[in-house]
Amino acid sequence: MSFDLASRLASRRAEDLYRQRPLLESAQGPDVVVDGQPLLAFCSNDYLGLANHPEVIAALRAGAERWGVGGGASHLVVGHSGPHHELELALAEFTGRPRALLFSTGYMANLGAVAALVGKGDTVLEDRLNHASLLDAGLLSGARFSRYLHNDPASLAARLDKAEGNTLVVTDGVFSMDGNLADLPALAAVAQARGAWLMVDDAHGFGPLGASGGGIVEHFGLGQEQVPVLIGTLGKGFGTAGAFVAGSEELIETLIQYARPYIYTTSQPPAVACATLKSLELLRRESWRRQHLAALIARFRHGAEALGLTLMDSFTPIQPILVGGSRQAVALAGMLRARGIMVGAIRPPTVPANSARLRVTLSAAHSEAQVDRLLEALGESWRQLSSSLLAEIEAEEGDDA
């Protein structure tokens, strides 16, 4: 029996869905070198510009000198070091919750939390546009799994009325491909009224959102009662690596006992925890980063709308430009790259069919001049793409004549 991998790959290519890894040959930042080409990048999730911050680098270096490089073992054996513990305490205080628990990746945090809380005989309900890790977690948990309409409390309520056992409602805080926010106050009210727990993965909210960078929960003024399970990642707004779950004493102890991705994984390097402690300090202290980022977002949206581009309803650093077809999105990204601009083309199955887009992401490390350069390149590339499509249509009509 053959797996016929060649045919599967050929099909991906034919559908303009084949993915390749760009090779980054520089540090993260607005100005990068990718595959040997200097580019101005608008595709990183380093929203506050902390990934290459000198103080964060110094903290990582000092942590490696003091604690070594590897975690050495799982947290439950001998891998839970001083910096890990200190970071968990700091994240608990930052989120206003009794406890926090570190995970090596956001994917693992989501898998671990969902599977530890629900199983056979229970129910997990998720937004249909949730991140793949959340959807995988629901499917793998063994619980009855259903998706409600995107950001629709009424759709959620209808599914909650049919739920069985312990019920977990799961949503992204900021939707990673659209940039819009979950309607947390309404979702929380619906969940509470029916005795369900709400779990929020705020991977893209921590850092940019909230007065102190506390994310979507701080943005809406909600607490642990409304959102019992709060997930955050450290590789985006924090600029380092890893993830955490914040919640009650009982929640965190339950995860330590039952979350398999936590139990059976080597801890992250303690030096990374040292770096994250410094980035957390900067995230909270330097509010100018959020203010500058908000100004850049407004500048970009104003300029893009003036160009006639189709934007999505987002005031976050994620600013998608809806294109439609996968081939057109890839072509537009290529035209930008020829002008020295790097923006990711996002295609199905990451997004629904016929909704391919350019996913522009802005950072506090960008300048106004760099945003203006992006807008200029977008205008030129969009006109070029429109001319190419018109020429193709005319050629097809000529063939049919």
Curated annotation (Swiss-Prot):
Its cofactor is pyridoxal 5'-phosphate. SUPFAM superfamilies: PLP-dependent transferases. Substrate binds at R19, H131, T350. GO terms for molecular function: 8-amino-7-oxononanoate synthase activity; pyridoxal phosphate binding. InterPro entries: Aminotrans_II_pyridoxalP_BS, Aminotransferase_I/II_large, AON_synthase_class-II, AONS_Archaea/Proteobacteria, AONS_Proteobacteria, PyrdxlP-dep_Trfase, PyrdxlP-dep_Trfase_major, PyrdxlP-dep_Trfase_small. Pathway: Cofactor biosynthesis; biotin biosynthesis. It comes from the Bacteria. One of its GO terms (biological process) is biotin biosynthetic process. The modification N6-(pyridoxal phosphate)lysine is found at K236. Homodimer. PANTHER family: 8-AMINO-7-OXONONANOATE SYNTHASE, CLASS II AMINOTRANSFERASE/8-AMINO-7-OXONONANOATE SYNTHASE. Belongs to the class-II pyridoxal-phosphate-dependent aminotransferase family. BioF subfamily. NCBIfam families: bioF (TIGR00858). Catalyzes the decarboxylative condensation of pimeloyl-[acyl-carrier protein] and L-alanine to produce 8-amino-7-oxononanoate (AON), [acyl-carrier protein], and carbon dioxide. This is 8-amino-7-oxononanoate synthase. The lineage of its organism: Bacteria, Pseudomonadati, Pseudomonadota, Gammaproteobacteria, Pseudomonadales.
